[in-house]
Each structure stands twice: as C-alpha cells, then as structure tokens.
A protein has these predicted regions:
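Helical element adjacent to the flavin cofactor pocket in flavoenzyme catalytic cores
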Residues: 138-189, 193-196
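Central helical "cap/lid" subdomain
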Residues: 38, 191-236
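Dinucleotide-binding Rossmann-like beta1-alpha1 core, especially the glycine-rich loop
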Residues: 46-126, 246, 287-289
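Glycine-rich FAD pyrophosphate-binding loop
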Residues: 22-42
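Beta1/beta-strand and adjacent pyrophosphate-binding region of the FAD-binding site
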Residues: 1-13, 29
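Active-site lid/adjacent beta-loop-alpha segment flanking the redox-cofactor pocket in flavoenzymes
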Residues: 231-326
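C-terminal catalytic lobe of FAD-dependent flavoproteins
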Residues: 289-370
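Short beta-strand to alpha-helix junction loop
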Residues: 61, 90-100, 139-157, 273-280
C-alpha cells in the first residue's frame, strides 16, 4: 500500500497528524510497531495540558493548542477527551522551592503566559485540600488536563473516518531514499511502503529509524511511572506539580487520581520492557501525602511504567531535514508531548503539505544539533 504521506508511529502525534492530513484530502498510511494504537507514552502519561514550567521554545505550540484547539477538541473528534481548564498549581515548601518556582513563573510570564507566584494561603484558597506544608506555589489559571487515552483514540477514530489507513503490528526498521529523497519505509516483516513524504513520530525508536538514512537525533530513554487510585467523590480539578518534580497529576472525571513521576529505574529495565516498581510508587505516595494528607487512605489500584524519548536539550525535534528531502521528524518530546499534540499534529500536516505553519518552529529544527 502506498500513500501521499506515510506516518511512522501510531501515538497521539502520529494520529493527530493523520487526522489533519486526512481532513485536507491527503492519503495517509500510519504504521505502528506494536499491536495497539497509542500503546506507548501517548496513553500512559499524566494528562497535563500546561504552559507553566515549559521551555520557552515549546510555548508557542502549547499556547496555540490551548487557545485554538483543546477547548473544541471533543467536538472536533466526536469523543469526550475530558478536557478541564481549571488551572495548574505547582507546589513548594522551602525557600529553594520558592526560588525554583519564581524562575519558572517569571520565564513563562515573560513569554505571555498568565502565571504568577502565590502564597501557601492563596494556594489553599484555590485548593483547600492542600496541607500547611505548602508555603508557595505558581498558579496558571489557563492550564488544565485531559484524558490521554480518549484524546489519542479520538484522533485515531476520526482520522480513520476521514480516510486514513492504519496498520498495527508493522514495525518499521528502515527508511530508503529514491533519487536522494526519503520515499520508502521497510518493515520487519519485509513489506515496503512508498510515499511522497514520511513523518517519523515513533518515540525513541525514531533515533534508530532515522539513522538508516544517516540522521542522528540525540535522544535517550527515561523511565516514567504512573499510579492510579480508586475512584472517590470529586475533590479538585486543578493539574498538580511540584518544584522538585517528585510527582504530578490530577483527579480524573470518573473520580480516580492519576499521578506520575520519573522512576530512575532505567538501569534495571530490560530493553523494550518498561519496569514498574513499588519503590517508585511509594516515593510518589510520600510526596503526595506531604502535600495532600486527605489522600492518605485512598487505595492505589494499579501502577504502570513507560518509556519517554528524552531529547538532549529537553525539547522536541519537529522539523524537515535538509539532508534528506521528504523526511519530517517529530520526536524527542521529553514527556511534554501530550499537551502540545493538537498543534503538533496541525503543523506536521502543514509541513507535509508545504504550507506555512501555524506557529514558528525554527527553535525546534533538527539542525540545531549540527
């Protein structure tokens, strides 16, 4: 099967790009290595849709997503993505935390984000479940959260409805050039697919696939862990984080809490097999109970782990590649991809269609590493 655009990777980035291309009448083929769409970080993350705490280079994408896409996304996809724009509290309890949070808030505010520092008492007025340990916080009222599974599946289903084709269990192992341009995709099963453009959005695997045409995106794998609790009655809707990044999360629409953290267990995980550990979950729970003592008796019902494709400078590569015409990179999202995915899907489609992009991507070009 051939298509005008081949997308390698069936996570939310690939699905969002497929949706935007198919909506414009472009024939699209999405190849996903695992048996399930969105089987990687796209459906395993904490669901944050945040501007606060981001590298300034990512802000145009997330600000565009929040202003123009997230509020309408459920209607666009005919799927409830459970988007709540109820703000983001990033918590601190020490003078060092105050310094960290002030730096993040000042940086974001300088780029037009509505974020400010507040006292512990002000934070407790926003969220009365916070403990007295909270002495400071950054507050961004326009941040929020959504359901990663529903958003990913929403993009997938609507892309299919618009004519995009998906093949799962088709692991891409090689790209091939024709007359100097990336045109063919080779899979582990020996199948060869051809397209006018190739979008590489396969997470950490993108590094190995890109290397087959001489391109190196400096990335490493980082292991993240997530825990989910039993469902309880509604308590609060803000997205949460901390100055030390020891946990992040929110309460979902159906009542459970979802919290995540970096586990640090990469040396112990087997290749391709994320390792979940009670050690990491316990560490997260201690931090959560420090700030939210009322959650102490809520039961944890499940934990899981997933790999994050961490770029060397902590922001993604979203870029054409001058050395390999026809190749478009979308990788290295470093755990920040979900919130910006609506805008990323849009700009990837615009790159593939040779259109001007909705936001400036110059700071995210591949050639910044050269």
């Amino acid at each position: 099967m051939n298509a005008e655009v081949i997308i390698v990777g069936g996570g939310i980035i690939g699905c969002a790009a497929a949706y935007n291309l198919a909506k414009n009448g472009i024939s699209v083929l999405v190849l996903e290595g695992s048996e399930n769409i969105g089987n990687g970080g796209s459906t395993r993350n904490g669901g944050g849709v945040r501007q606060s705490g981001r590298d300034p280079r990512e802000l145009p994408l997330v600000m565009y997503s929040i202003e123009h896409i997230w509020p309408q996304l459920s209607d666009m996809l005919d799927t409830n993505v459970e988007y709540y724009q109820e703000g983001n509290l990033r918590l601190g309890s020490t003078p060092q935390h105050q310094k960290i949070l002030t730096g993040l808030a000042d940086s974001a505010a300088a780029h037009g984000v509505d974020v400010r520092m507040i006292t512990g008492d002000e934070a407790r007025r926003i969220n009365p479940y916070l403990s007295e340990a909270v002495t400071c916080a950054s507050w961004c009222p326009t941040d929020g959260h959504a359901n990663p599974l529903m958003a990913t599946m929403g993009y997938y289903k609507m892309a299919r409805r618009l004519g995009a084709h998906f093949i799962s269990g088709e692991k891409v192992v090689e790209l091939r050039k024709i007359k100097g341009a990336a045109r063919q995709v080779v899979t582990a099963s020996g199948n060869v697919y051809e397209g006018d453009k190739i979008i590489l959005a396969a997470g950490y695997e993108s590094r190995f696939i890109a290397s087959t045409v001489g391109i190196d995106v400096p990335m490493q794998q980082v292991l993240l862990e997530t825990l989910v609790t039993e469902a309880v009655g509604p308590m609060f809707w803000q997205m949460l984080g901390t100055a030390d990044a020891d946990f992040y999360g929110h309460q979902t629409e159906h009542g459970s809490f979802v919290f995540g953290l970096n586990s640090g267990l990469e040396p112990y995980a087997k290749p391709g097999k994320p390792l979940s550990s009670s050690i990491a979950a316990s560490a997260a729970c201690r931090g959560i109970m420090h700030y939210f003592p009322d959650l102490a008796n809520i039961k944890v019902v499940r934990t899981w782990a997933g790999w994050m494709d961490a770029c060397a400078d902590h922001v993604p590569v979203i870029s054409k590649v001058e050395e390999v015409p026809g190749l478009i990179l979308a990788c290295g999202f470093t755990g920040h991809g979900f919130g910006i995915s609506p805008a990323v899907g849009l700009v990837l489609s615009q790159l593939a269609m040779e259109q001007e992009t909705a936001v400036d991507l110059s700071a995210l070009r591949y050639d910044r590493f050269q």
